[in-house]
Amino acid sequence: MLDQGVWAEVRVGGEQLRLFSERNAQGVQASVYNVTAKNWIAPSEPVDDIEQGKDRAVAHARAYLRKSGNLELPSLEWKKSNSA
């Protein structure tokens, strides 16, 4: 069950990614989902807190976009996640 968290969506080139930093029953985790390909670029990775999770998700998304088409990560608008 989700306790708290944030998420952001990126659309650049032909890519659509969702970045997550969330606290749940397993602890605080960061992840990145590729909406276009319907797979996880970075599945749940344990982090110390929500802010570190945001940083890790951004790093994974930035690396993926550079590798997949030399694309730059635009500025993000983080939104609060809904509780389950």
Where do the language-model regions lie?
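Short N-terminal "domain-start" leader segments
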Residues: 1-29, 83
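Mixed-charge, Lys/Arg-enriched low-complexity segments
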Residues: 33-84
